[in-house]
Amino acid sequence: FGTGTHETTRLCIELIEKHMREGDNVLDIGCGSGILSIASLLLGASHADAVDIDPNAVDIAYTNAGMNGIGRDTYTVVSGNILADDELDKAYSGKKYDVVEANIVADVIIALTEKIPKYIKDGGIFVSSGIIVERLDDVLEALKSRGFALIEVVKDKGWAAVASKYEG
């Protein structure tokens, strides 16, 4: 995970490349190595905020960003649990992102569907993966129940990634 070789990472980047627009601002939840937010910036995002529950992810993501010529003026990484930390939740609720990305696991994505409407603009794109195909219907149902319309599902080797649009 986080190196670009795992199916979920490749599927997410494929969807980001298709659905993100140049100049979009991005929130990467569960950023790990930073690969999705860094790819988004390299593909033309104007700014990316990234968060991960593992404090080690901050230095790793900043190191990887630097290796790709991305500075802290366009990239911000913090450590915390966006599902449990009220202060972190408030910080991201104060912004509205064009694109929200999460490559985690189905259960966390389902939990995030309750929070993401606070972070995403109307018409914004949510790209999610880390979903085994057996859990895809559960994720799609959670998205639909929270005001997301399905744009596209891509699959590879038992994994799925979803692009959906927030319609409020």
Task: Give each language-model segment a name.
Residues T3-I82:
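Conserved SAM/SAH cofactor-binding pocket of Class I
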Residues I53-E167:
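S-adenosylmethionine
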